Curated annotation (Swiss-Prot):
Functional note: Probable core component of the endosomal sorting required for transport complex III (ESCRT-III) which is involved in multivesicular bodies (MVBs) formation and sorting of endosomal cargo proteins into MVBs. MVBs contain intraluminal vesicles (ILVs) that are generated by invagination and scission from the limiting membrane of the endosome and mostly are delivered to lysosomes enabling degradation of membrane proteins, such as stimulated growth factor receptors, lysosomal enzymes and lipids. The MVB pathway appears to require the sequential function of ESCRT-O, -I,-II and -III complexes.
Key words of the record: Acetylation, Coiled coil, Cytoplasm, Endosome, Membrane, Phosphoprotein, Protein transport, Transport
Chain positions found as Phosphoserine: S199
Membrane topology: Peripheral membrane protein
Single GO BP term: late endosome to vacuole transport
Name the record gives this protein: Charged multivesicular body protein 2b
PANTHER family: CHARGED MULTIVESICULAR BODY PROTEIN
Protein family (similarity comment): Belongs to the SNF7 family.
Chain segments carrying region Disordered: 178-202
Broad class of where this protein is predominantly found: cytoplasm
Species in which this protein is naturally found: Bos taurus (Bovine)
Bias (Low complexity) ranges: 179-194
Cystine residue pairs: none
Subcellular location: Cytoplasm, Cytosol; Late endosome membrane
Length: 213
């Protein structure tokens, strides 16, 4: 019951009009077919009257034929008009839909513009840029600190490599025995003796101190 009292939309009205126009078009086509049938019958009658020499009958039938052909011509004009109306209705419907879409879009844009504050948006972008710069600076400081730490570790490893190389040059192996070695003050010769040639006895004494047989 509710659908009976529902207000028709524009689409509903246009659909009804199109149905009526299609019905009118079919009726015009049927009328034209009937007129063409009558036209052929009149032509046959005129030929028949002409064969028997009945001029008066031929004249009357000829007038009817002229009137019928005029009526048939009118059906073509009316049919073209109906087709034009149907096309125009479709165009109007399309234009109304586009206008409705534009109206909806305009309302949406208006609502968005009301919600959006240009000053607030600009401030948000500036804050983002500021915080991003802070983050980049913090990251750079952390990277510099880590580089310093690891660079120091590399220096320590490099120093240890130099010590190992020097000990290796004088024929001392330190694999697992450096902890048992005497301190540098006792194991290393003085500045005056370091300049002299190290004797075999000195080397043997250092090896025994390191626990090397």
């Amino acid at each position: 019951m509710a659908s009976l009292f529902k207000k028709k939309t524009v689409d509903d009205v246009i659909k009804e009009q199109n149905r009526e126009l299609r019905g009118t078009q079919r009726a015009i086509i049927r009328d034209r077919a009937a007129l063409e049938k009558q036209e052929k019958q009149l032509e046959l009658e005129i030929k028949k009257m002409a064969k028997i020499g009945n001029k008066e009958a031929c004249r009357v039938l000829a007038k009817q034929l002229v009137h019928l052909r005029k009526q048939k011509t009118r059906t073509f004009a009316v049919s073209s008009k109906v087709t034009s109306m149907s096309t125009q209705t479709k165009v109007m419907n399309s234009q109304m839909k586009m206008a409705g879409a534009m109206s909806t879009t305009a309302k949406t844009m208006q609502a968005v513009n009301k919600k959006m504050d240009p000053q607030k948006t600009l401030q948000t972008m500036q804050n983002f840029q500021k915080e991003n710069m802070k983050m980049e600076m913090t990251e750079e400081m952390i990277n510099d600190t880590l580089d310093d730490i690891f660079d120091g570790s590399d220096d320590e490893e490099e120093s240890q490599d130099i010590v190992n190389q020097v000990l290796d040059e004088i024929g001392i192996e330190i694999s697992g025995k450096m902890a048992k070695a005497p301190s540098a003050a006792r194991s290393l010769p003085s500045a005056s003796t370091s300049k002299s040639t190290i004797s075999d006895e000195e080397i043997e004494r250092q090896l025994k101190a390191l626990g090397v047989d």
